[in-house]
A protein has these predicted regions:
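Short beta-strand/turn micro-motifs at beta-sheet edges
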Residues: 30, 65-66
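Short, hinge-like loop/turn segments at secondary-structure boundaries
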Residues: 54-56
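Catalytic helix-loop patch of NAD(P)-dependent Rossmann-fold dehydrogenases
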Residues: 1-37, 42-52
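Conserved active-site helix of classical SDR/Rossmann-fold NAD(P)-dependent CH-OH oxidoreductases
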Residues: 18-25, 58-63, 95-96, 121
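C-terminal substrate-binding subdomain of Rossmann-fold SDR/epimerase-dehydratase oxidoreductases
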Residues: 67-183
Length: 183
């Protein structure tokens, strides 16, 4: 987490997260506390919103699909080239992890992420496919807006504590969110 500076596109958020980790570790050391933290990968859920032109990827993607569908469209426009790799975790899984930590008295800090690591293009394609829009096209505009090439998260430490945990597959979770947003 502390190796090199955060990526410029996410600098403030990433730096704040690093400060939180340093503070928690300092409290644990100075006061003998057992505070811990989990670091989730990109999250999505039924409660994610798209406001003021800014949104997390999954919410923005779904909003674009829903908007184009309402206009009778059959394509969506996305920034970049679709090549960056990302891991997305259904927010309900994070709630289950926190509950499991409490139930099992686990006070360790670790990353939590769905191990599925897909390109932005594949994530968009999955989202279209599971929602009955396999024939839709994706237009990538502004290739210079690609962002960081990959943001891999190791969950090896998490799996030491919860080796049997089953994450919601992206296809299943994004379909659930789409159904919720279109009802």
């Amino acid at each position: 987490m502390f190796a090199g500076p955060p990526t410029p596109t996410n600098f403030e958020y990433a730096y704040a997260k690093r400060c939180m980790v340093a503070l928690i570790e300092a409290y644990n050391k100075q006061y003998g506390m057992q505070y811990c933290y989990i670091t989730p990968s990109n999250l999505y859920s039924e409660l994610d919103t798209h406001k003021g032109g800014r949104a997390h990827y999954a919410a923005s993607l779904l909003d674009k699909i829903i908007e184009q569908d309402s206009l009778g469209g059959s394509s969506i426009k996305l920034l970049g080239t679709g090549s960056p790799l990302r891991q997305f975790t259904y927010a309900g899984d994070i709630a289950l992890v926190i509950k499991a930590m409490i139930d099992n008295n686990v006070w360790a800090s670790f990353n939590v992420s769905n191990p599925e690591n897909y390109s932005i293009h594949k994530l968009a394609r999955i989202t279209l496919d599971v929602n009955g829009k396999s024939d839709w096209t994706i237009d990538y505009s502004q290739p210079h807006m690609n962002g960081q090439a990959r943001k891999d998260v190791s969950i090896d430490k998490f799996l030491q504590y919860f080796p049997e945990f089953v994450f919601t597959k992206f296809a299943d979770g994004i379909k659930k969110v789409y159904i919720d947003k279109t009802k």
